Amino acid sequence: MDPASSDMGGEATGEHLADELCEAYLGDNEDDGGDELQRLSRERDFWKHMFNQLVAEYPEGILITAADGTVTHWNERFSDHMKMARSDALGEDASDVFSTAEESETLPEAVVRTGDTVEEEEPHDVPTDSLCQYHGVPLRAPTGDVVGSFGVVPDISEKVKNQRELHDLHETVSSNVGEHLSELSESIDEVGSFAEETEAFAGEEIERMEGVADEVSNQSATIEEIASSAEEVSQASQRAQDRATEGEQTAETAIDRMGAVQESAERVNDTIDGLTSQADEMSEIIDAINDIADQTNMLALNASIEAARAGEKGEGFAVVADEVKSLAEESQERADEIEQMIVEMVETTDQTADRIGQTTTEIEEAITAVRETLDSLQEIRKAVDETATGVKEVAGATDDHAASTEQVAATTDEAVDKLTELEDRLDNLSQIASEQHDRVAEIEDMVDELVE
């Protein structure tokens, strides 16, 4: 169907409104002696002036060519882009003054040849070192014949810059976060392994302490025969002393390893703070993209208004304005999606930080429990020393020996209780480490999704 005859109802309405705009002008300048020819001449001058004003005052570069490629309109904004005076460009062939990425023909020529809207696929450099992108629509006569092209050439340097910065930031986040998450995962695995090893140690110590308790109970039961079995009691005391010494050494080792794990947890917290800071930087870039999209929407709105005022002659320009507006809205929607992903990543990171804090607390409590166990072991060793001394003085110190034996039994029971508590705490710590490992995997998935 001939474009000039399509959608007649809509065009009639637009022409009527445009006529009212023109009538307002003609009514103010009506000459009682004027004939129809003069009126048509003034109407022609009115629309010509409106068109030229639109081209001259439009905030982006405008390039209009005739069907043969001759430049007919070239506004000052486009002169700024191309570093070429308007007077030097008018009347020249478009291929001589405006080169594009197309090799076989210029984009204005493609618009005239196809009779369709043409948009440059990739932006190109202009003499001002800016990046521009051509959008062209065909200009049609009332018969529907293409008589030229109307091109808008906006400066998209800032938009491209922001897109490149966002891409670079994606790459940085992917690299840095991946490295930090790997370290975090290793630290959590280390916590889990340490917790399992220490839990096993606690179980062994419980068995040892129960054995010591049994031995001390046997000593207490046979206190009346201590004179005849002094050597046996002395040997048992020595074994208890050796085990207490081993327990002290093991407890000190456990304290050192827990301290190292606590430092790892603190480094993980610092890493999470760094992730939060990078998320804030991404939010700032998203805000900048949203601002640019808002400004682009405003330009598209102004262009639509000017196109409505221009009536049929601005129809092609309205198509360009709608396309620019659609691009701006799509950019804003993508920015909002990325911003939501950042918010979710920050929330998950904050939860991870809380769990790490809980892990640190559990480690501190475990260190306290081990220190208490160490104190108990030292008391056991001291009590065993007293027992050994009592054995040597068995003849005159039977009552003292019995009291020392009871103290060893009580202290051993206390050590068993402390080790049992430590075993429970380490089991809880192992569960927390497993949960943290799962959370790290979730963050890694979110980062991969964000980069994609």
From Swiss-Prot:
Domain PAS residues, every copy: 47-121
Localization per Swiss-Prot or TrEMBL: Cytoplasm
Alphabetized PROSITE patterns for the sequence: CHEMOTAXIS_TRANSDUC_2 (PS50111)
Pfam families documented for this protein: MCPsignal (PF00015), PAS_4 (PF08448)
Key word Cytoplasm present: yes
Main location group: cytoplasm
Record-annotated Methyl-accepting transducer domain positions: 180-416
Gene Ontology process terms (BP): chemotaxis; signal transduction
Protein transport is among the record's keywords: no
GO CC, one annotated term: cytoplasm
Record field: compositional bias (Low complexity): 229-239
Function: Mediates chemotaxis towards arginine. Probably transduces the signal to the histidine kinase CheA.
Name this protein carries in UniProt: Transducer protein Car
Species per Swiss-Prot/TrEMBL record: Halobacterium salinarum (strain ATCC 29341 / DSM 671 / R1)
